[in-house]
Amino acid sequence: MAKGKENRIIVTLECTEAKKEGKPVSRYTTTKNKKNTTERLILKKYNPNLKRHTEHKEIK
């Protein structure tokens, strides 16, 4: 029988550059496999408030 999806969790990514500039932060949600990716995710995503691609880090 197939195993369940207990290894995948939903995480929230928050813009780091908007915080430094004092502008509204953008947030994205995604999933990650907690067995394969134990450290926090860092992805480049589009921030509509800054109108450019910025670094988004995983928050709790």
Swiss-Prot record:
One of its GO terms (molecular function) is structural constituent of ribosome. Keywords: Ribonucleoprotein, Ribosomal protein. It comes from the Bacteria. One of its GO terms (cellular component) is ribonucleoprotein complex. NCBIfam families: PRK00504.1, PRK00595.1, rpmG_bact. Belongs to the bacterial ribosomal protein bL33 family. This is Large ribosomal subunit protein bL33. It comes from Chlorobaculum parvum (strain DSM 263 / NCIMB 8327) (Chlorobium vibrioforme subsp. thiosulfatophilum).
